[in-house]
Amino acid sequence: MKKLSILLAIIMIIGIFAGCSNTNNANADEIRIGVNYELSGDNATYGNSAVEGIELAVEQINAAGGINGKKIKLIKYDNKSEPAEATTLTTRLMTQDKVVAVLGPATSGAFKATIPVAIQNKIPVASGSATADDVTVDSSGVKEYAFRICYSDSYQGTAMANFALNNLSAKKAVIIMDSSSDYGKGLAENFTKTFEDGGGTIVAQEAYVAKDTDFNAILTKIKGEEFDVIFIPGYYNEAGLIIKQARAQGIDVPILGADGFDSPVLLELAGAEALNNVYFSNHYSSLDENPVVVKFIEDFKAKYNKEPDAFNALGYDLARFVADAISRAENLNGESVKKALEETTDFEGVTGSFSIDEN
């Protein structure tokens, strides 16, 4: 009889632990959401801006009563702009901190590195700014636990090529690309296709890698070509220096980029004068008169005493997007939240209205 009692107790304990692992924080007074962003390192501008937006959104949600009466608790870590660290932190957030979803990272490479962990643990990861085309679907199929709320590199690469052709009447372009990132390679590929399909010619394509600082050899080389624009698919750290050094060499043609240019560090590195005739695509405009945008700007300025940038807006939208799904989820676990995310339609955010499709 004693053996039977011990056996029953063991079975009950196993059942309790199994229930905890499946429901995460279903019985807690709070809802845990992971925050895995680039708070230091090369891409810290993106991460810190996104987290400011996330924290504003969560502050507002909690002040309004939380999600179905439960407050959100953010579990925040710095992935140091390193994909390997982002992966490690995702594992920690899901297996130790017991979150129901993870927000971030900001960059495509780091975000993609976390997706296998999400799939293994059946807990969704969501990014506001991972723009690489293969973030949510690739040749192997749909990545079911990965979500994003931003446009893709094919979209913005195409948009910038059309801008060069139609708005700047460019016929010849040079590409100086970050060959060390999926982001840079994807943008270059899509810009090239659209520009050439529109009758333009890529007269030169040069490459650099992240952390390069001296681009004078590349710029001296392209000065021997005739071109109307330069497209730089890369991040602000290198782009700012390329722009500064190009202007110093007397290259005054329009310089184009994508959302990776969106950082005050670009201005610090390049200087205000060098940024004349520089254009880049972005997710958000502070001039938008949409009431949702106007209210966000007012609230953001009240909290942080500064104007919001696009990554602030994307972080804000991302937190609200995931919170909305959690409010509709059948249970507080990763699988239920993932299903609710998939069912999102016509979500109106600061950066636009969006719905989740099968890809």
Model-derived regions, located:
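Segments of small-molecule ligand-sensing domains
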Residues: 302-312, 323-359
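Extracytoplasmic "Venus flytrap"
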Residues: 34-53, 77-84, 106-107, 176-185, ...
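Short, low-complexity disordered leader/linker segments with a strong preference
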Residues: 1-32, 63
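Extracellular/periplasmic periplasmic-binding protein-like sensory domains
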Residues: 243-316
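Extracytoplasmic ligand/sensor domains, especially the bilobed periplasmic-binding protein
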Residues: 98-204, 254-277
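Short, surface-exposed alpha-helical segments at coil->helix boundaries
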Residues: 44-55, 158, 184-192, 290, ...
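Beta-alpha junction/loop-to-helix N-cap segments that form part of ligand/metal-binding clefts
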Residues: 23-28, 46-52, 64-137, 208-215, ...
